[in-house]
C-alpha cells in the first residue's frame, strides 16, 4: 500500500462525508492530489525537466481554480500535461488528460456532478488511469443497490400508480415528496404530468414556485460515497467487479 494510495484513500473518505452531507466537494481535494502526485512521481522519475513541466501544469490548474479571473490558465495546464506526455511519455500526464476528457463528457451529459469528475481527474494523476478506471467501474456497481432502495421506497409509498409507462424508470432514481420539503441539494424533475427522466444536476435549480403539491426529485447520487467504498474494496479485489457480475449474469442465462 503506497503513499499515493493512502493519500487518495484519505481524500475519498473526507470527500464521501462531504458529499453525503452537502452534495458538494471542496476543490482542495482534487487539487491536493495533483500536488501530492507530482512530488511522489519525482521519487520514481528523476527527470527534473519532466518534474518542472508537470509542476507548472499543476500550478496553472491550481490558479485557474483558485482565482476566477485566471480560469483560462487551466488550458495552459492541460497543454503542459500534453507536452509532458509527448516529450517523456508520462503515464500520469496521459492519465490526467484521459480523465479530463472523460470528466468533461460526463459533466456536460449530466451523468455526473463537477465535483465527482474533478475528483477522478485528481485521482487519475495521483494513481494512474488504470487504477482510476477500476475505482470508477466498481463505484458504478455500488449505485445498483442504491437505486433498488429508492425503488422499494417508491413501491411502498405507491408512487408508481399514477406514472405513465414511459416514466417508470423514474422509480429507480427519484422520490416523490411535497414541494415544501425539497432540500437544496435535490433536483426537481417535475410532477406527474410534466416529467423529465434526465435530471439537470449541473444547472441552476428549478424554481419551486412553478409547482404545487407533490413533485418528483432526485436526491443526486452521492457518488463520492461509492468511490470511497470502491476504494476500500480495491484492497480485497483489485479488479473491476462489475465485469464479473456481467459475466455471471450472462452465464446464468446461456
Swiss-Prot record:
Its main location: membrane. GO terms for cellular component: plasma membrane. This is Uncharacterized protein MJ1282.1. One of its GO terms (molecular function) is aspartic-type endopeptidase activity. It is a multi-pass membrane protein. InterPro entries: Preflagellin_Peptidase, Prepilin_IV_endopep_pep. It is found in: Cell membrane. To M.jannaschii MJ0902. Keywords: Cell membrane, Membrane, Transmembrane, Transmembrane helix.
Amino acid at each position: 500500500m503506497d503513499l499515493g494510495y493512502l493519500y487518495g484513500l484519505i481524500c475519498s473518505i473526507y470527500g464521501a462525508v462531504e458529499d453525503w452531507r452537502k452534495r458538494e466537494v471542496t476543490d482542495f481535494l482534487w487539487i491536493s492530489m495533483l500536488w501530492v502526485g507530482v512530488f511522489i512521481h519525482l521519487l520514481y522519475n528523476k527527470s527534473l525537466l519532466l518534474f518542472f513541466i508537470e509542476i507548472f501544469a499543476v500550478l496553472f490548474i491550481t490558479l485557474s481554480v483558485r482565482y476566477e479571473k485566471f480560469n483560462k490558465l487551466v488550458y495552459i495546464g492541460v497543454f503542459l500535461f500534453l507536452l509532458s506526455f509527448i516529450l517523456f511519455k508520462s503515464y500520469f500526464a496521459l492519465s490526467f488528460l484521459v480523465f479530463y476528457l472523460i470528466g468533461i463528457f460526463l459533466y456536460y451529459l449530466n451523468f455526473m456532478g463537477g465535483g465527482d469528475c474533478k475528483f477522478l481527474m485528481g485521482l487519475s494523476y495521483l494513481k494512474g488511469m488504470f487504477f482510476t478506471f477500476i475505482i470508477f467501474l466498481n463505484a458504478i456497481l455500488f449505485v445498483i443497490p442504491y437505486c433498488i432502495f429508492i425503488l422499494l421506497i417508491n413501491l411502498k409509498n405507491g408512487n408508481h400508480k399514477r406514472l405513465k409507462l414511459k416514466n417508470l424508470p423514474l422509480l429507480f432514481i427519484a422520490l416523490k415528496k411535497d414541494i415544501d420539503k425539497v432540500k437544496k441539494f435535490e433536483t426537481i424533475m417535475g410532477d406527474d404530468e410534466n416529467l423529465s427522466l434526465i435530471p439537470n444536476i449541473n444547472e441552476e435549480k428549478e424554481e419551486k414556485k412553478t409547482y404545487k403539491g407533490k413533485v418528483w426529485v432526485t436526491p443526486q447520487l452521492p457518488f463520492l460515497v461509492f468511490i470511497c467504498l470502491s476504494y476500500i474494496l480495491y484492497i480485497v479485489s483489485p479488479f473491476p467487479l462489475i465485469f464479473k457480475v456481467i459475466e455471471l449474469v450472462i452465464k446464468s442465462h446461456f
